[in-house]
Amino acid sequence: MLRRAASNAYSWWWASHVRTKQSKWLEENLQDIEEKVEYALKLLEDEGDSFAKRAEMYYKRRPELISFVEESFKAYRALAERYDHISKELQNANTTIASVFPDQVPEFAMNEDDDDDAPVSPRHHKNKTSNKNVPKVPDLPIKDPEAAKKMFMSRKAIQEQNASSVVNKSGLSKTEAVEEIDKLQKEILVLQTEKEFVKTSYENGLAKYWEIEKCIMEKQGKVSSLQDEFDEGAVVIEDKEAQILMSTTALKSCQEKLEELRDKQEQNVKEVDVSRKQISESTEEFGNLSDALLGDGKGNHEIYSEKEKLESLGEKVNDEFDDSEAKSCLTIPDVADKIDELVNDVINLENLFSSQAALIHRLREEIDDLKAQIRALQKENNSSQTDDNMDMGKKLKEMEEKVNGVKDIDQEVEEKSDNIDKHLTRAHMKLSFLSKRLKSLTQEGEDEELKATNVPIQDIGSLTDTKFPEENIDDTVVSENALDIKSASEVVFAEKDLSDEVNQEEAIETKTKEASLSDLEKHISSPKSDIITTQESSDELFLQKLLAHGIEGREKHLLTEYTKVLRNYKEVKKLLHETETKLKNVNTLKDEGKDQQRGQLFMLICREDNNATNAITGQKQRMSPNEEQLGARVDALLSENLNLLVRFSNSFGKIQQFDTGIKDLHGEMLKIIKQKNQDGGKNTLRSNVRPIYKHLSEIRTEMTVWLEKSLLLKEEINIRASTLSDIHNEITEALKTDSEDSEIKFTIYQGAKFEGEVSNMKKENNRIAEELQTGLDQVTKLMKDADTTLEKLSEEFSLSESNTQSSQDRSRIPLRSFIFDRKPKKQRLSLFSCIQPSLSKMKKPAGS
C-alpha cells in the first residue's frame, strides 16, 4: 500500500499529459462516441421504401437520433470542460517552470509540438536541443554587432542574462522556490499515503458492510419462509428489548474495534521506538562528524530528550471523565445516546490512526534520507582534505537543519501518539461504564429469575426448587467478568475509590457462601452432594486468600469463584434431572397399574351386560302377538322413514342447482344489458338474449314441477306425523295400564325400545318438515325473481314465449321460389307430428 502511495505521489504530472493512450477516460469516451456514430449512420442509411418503414423511421428511429445528438453534445461539453481545466493547469505549470527555470522554456515549447506518446526525460531534451541548435555557417555576413556578440557568448552567460531578464511572479528566489517545491512534494506524499490508508480502511469496511447485509438478507429470508410455513405473523420486538439488543451489539462492536486499535497502537509504538533509536544513532554520528570537522565541540550530541510527564495519562483522563456523565445515564435511551457518542469517538480514533501511520511513514523516509546524507558527508571527509571551511560549515548547517526537521516530525508523532493513547483510554472507560450501566438498567426492569441468574452466589440452596437457564448464567457472568477484568486492567486508578465497597462486598460474599454451603448440605442428601461438601474447606481457604490479597487480582479470584459456583450449579442440575427421571419412572409404573385395574373393571362390566342381555333375550322369546304386531308396524315405519329421507335429500339438492343457475343467468344478463347501454343496438343483442330467456323459462318450469312434488311430500310428512303420534299414544297407554289381559300388556324393556324408536322418528319427521318448508320458501322466492327477470327481458328486448315459438314454427318461404315464382314442395310429416298430433294443433292457433 505504501508503494502504491509512493507511485501515485506524482500522478498529477502524468495526468496533465492528456493523451489517448494515457487517459483511460478519454479512450473510453472516444470508443463510445465511435460506436454511437456507427449506429447513427446505420439508421440514416436505411431507405424508406414503404409507408411502414417511413413510419418506423419517424416514430422509432427519430427519437434515437435525437438522443444521440444530445449525448454527443454532452460528451463534447464534458470534453471541452476537461480540456479547459487541463489547459489552465498546463498554463500555470508552464509559467511556474518558466519563472524558475528560464533556460528550459524553449524545450517545453518544443515538447508541446511533439507527438510521441511516451514521456521524454530532460536529458534527452537537452541532447536534442544541443544537436539541433548547432550554429551553421551563415550565408551572408552579419551586420548587427550585438547579434555577433551574442553568438560568441557562452551558454552560461546567456542563461544568466535570460534569468535576470525574467520577472518572478511568485516573488521567490530560485533556492526558495526549490525549497518550497520540495516541501510541497513531501506534503503531497504524506497526503497520498494517508489517502491510501483511508482508502484501504474504507474498502475493508465496505466489504464487511456488504457481508453483514448479505447475512441480514439470508436471515430475513429464513424468517419469512418460517412464517409462511407455520402461518405465523411478524413477531414484534418491544422497544426496550430492541434498544437493549442494539446497544449490546454496538458495545460489542466498539470493544472489538478498540482491541484492534490497541494492537495497532502497540505496533506503532514499537516502530516509533525503532525509529527513535535510529535517530539517536544518526545524531551521535553527526555530532562526532561535526566535532572532527570543526573541532570546537559545538556538536549537538543531545538531540532527542523525552518529555517528562508530570501526571500519568490515567489521572488526566480521570479528571476529564466527569461525574455528570454517570448522572446523565439514567435511562436506556440516555445510554443509547452515549453509545452513539462512543461510536463517533471510535471513528475519530480510526482517522487519527491513519494520519499517525502517514506520519510514521514520513519519519522513516526522513531518517533514511538523513542516514544517506551523513554517509555521503563521511565519505567526502575521508576522501578529500579540503581547506574550504565555509563550504563544510554550510553543509553541516544544512545537515543540522535536517536533523531538527526529523526531530520535529518525531515530536509530532509523539504528540499524536499521546493523543491517541488518551482517546483510547477514555473510550475504554466509556465502554466499561456504559456496559455496567446498561446491565444495571436491565436488571432493574427484570423479575426475580433474572436477578437469580445475575447473582448466583446469594442463594445456592434454592437451586433444587427453581430451574435456571444455564446459557443465560454462563453468558451474563462470563461476559460481565471478562469486561470487568479488561476495564480494571486498563484503568487501574479507578479501583482506588472503590476499595471500601469491595471489602464490604467480599465480607458479604463470604457470609453468603457459608450460608449457601450449609443450605446445600441440608437440601441435597444424595451421593452426589459429597462432591460439593468436600469442597467446603478449599472454598474457605480460597476466601481467606481473597481477603489477604485485597484489591489486587480480585477479578481473577471472583472469576474462579463464579466458575466454581457454576460447576456446583451444573452438578445440582444433574441431580435434579436424575430425580426427575426417577419420578417419571415411578409415575409410569403407577399408570400401568391403573390401566390394569381399568381393564379388570371393564371385564366385570362386560360380564354383567352379557348377563342382562341374556335375560332380555329370554324375555324376548316370550313376546305376545300384540307386541309382535306393533313391532312389525314400527319396522315398516322405519323403512318408510328411510325412503322418505332419500326422496327428501334428492329433492332438496335441486334447490342449490336452481340457485346457481339463476345467478349465472343474472350475471350474463347484466353483461348484456351493460353492453346494450354502451352500444345502443337492440337487434344485435337480441340473439344473445334469446338463449338466456329460454334457459330461464326452463328453470322456472322445473321449479314449478318441484313445488308440486314438494307439496305432495309435505302432505305425506304430515300424515306420517299423525301416524307416529297415534302409535306413541298407544305405547304409552299400554305401558300405563295395569290390566291382566296379556294381549295388551308389554314388558318394560320392549315398551321402552318401541317408545324410543317412535320418538326418534317423530323428531326426524319434524326436522324434515322444517327443512322442506324452508326449501319451499326459497324456491318460491327464486320463482318470483325468475318471473321479474323474464318480464324485464320481454319488455327491453321484445321477447316472449309465444313469439319465440311462432318464429320457430312459422313456415319459411324459400328465396328461390320468391324470386322465380315456384311452388314449394309439400313438406313431409315428421315422426314427432305423427306421434303427437295434438301439439301441432295447439301450435297452429298460437301461430295464427
From Swiss-Prot:
This is Protein NETWORKED 2C. InterPro entries: NAB, NET2A-D/KIP1-like_C, NET2A-D/KIP1-like_dom. PANTHER family: PROTEIN NETWORKED 2C, PROTEIN NETWORKED 2D. GO terms for molecular function: actin binding. Belongs to the NET family. One of its GO terms (cellular component) is membrane. It holds the Pfam family KIP1. The gene is NET2C.
